[in-house]
């Protein structure tokens, strides 16, 4: 496995994403746990130490299965990523409740990486609304040690991307964007990389 250094942490360059785990009878929420656990074991034994999930993957069940799978390994041996579900504007008033539930579902006391999920034109006003206090709350969780690194995932146009960075750039350590190595114009990836 090839690893990279991120702020003193050894991260596998190949990560394990859990948006599309094996399912039973084609039903997205019904994860085939036996097959999923085999996949986690294979990845872990072959050096993958970066695991990515999110609140909404598999209708909320991805985090549960990821928690079961990773609880079998020493916590310091892997890097766990999940995300605040900003794709649903109804979640903004519930940031504390959601964060606590994610810790429970993932059977962990902290997240190595935590993202503001799917920043886009649809939800940017909620991310920028001080009434919700999402930024302040998640920064406080980082200060308390329950988040090591705070970032965001983006599916917006460049103007929305810049607005988010203007407001959150002082606390952001990393970003996930849609990047197609053969088509750098997809979702304005080239321009986003320039702005990071």
Label each PLM-derived region with a short phrase.
Residues 19-21, 54-56, 83-87, 116-119, ...:
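Active-site beta-loop-alpha junctions enriched in small/polar residues
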Residues 20-34, 83-93, 122-127, 156:
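Active-site mouth loops of central-metabolism enzymes
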């Amino acid at each position: 496995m090839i690893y990279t250094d991120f702020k003193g942490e050894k991260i596998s360059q190949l990560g394990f994403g859990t948006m599309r785990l094996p399912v039973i009878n084609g039903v997205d929420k019904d994860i085939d746990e036996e097959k999923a656990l085999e996949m986690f074991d294979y990845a872990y034994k072959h050096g993958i130490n970066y695991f990515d999930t999110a609140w909404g993957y598999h209708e909320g069940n991805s985090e549960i299965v990821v928690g079961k799978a990773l609880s079998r390994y020493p916590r310091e041996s892997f890097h766990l990523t999940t995300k605040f579900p900003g794709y649903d504007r109804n979640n903004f008033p519930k940031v504390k409740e959601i964060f606590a539930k994610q810790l429970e579902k993932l059977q962990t006391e902290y997240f190595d990486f935590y993202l503001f999920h799917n920043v886009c034109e649809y939800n940017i006003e909620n991310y920028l609304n001080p009434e919700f206090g999402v930024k302040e709350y998640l920064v406080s969780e980082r200060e308390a040690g329950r988040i090591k690194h705070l970032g965001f995932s983006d599916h917006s146009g460049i103007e929305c991307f810049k607005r988010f960075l203007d407001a959150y750039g002082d606390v952001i350590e990393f970003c996930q964007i849609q990047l197609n190595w053969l088509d750098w114009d997809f979702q304005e990836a080239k321009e986003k990389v320039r702005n990071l």
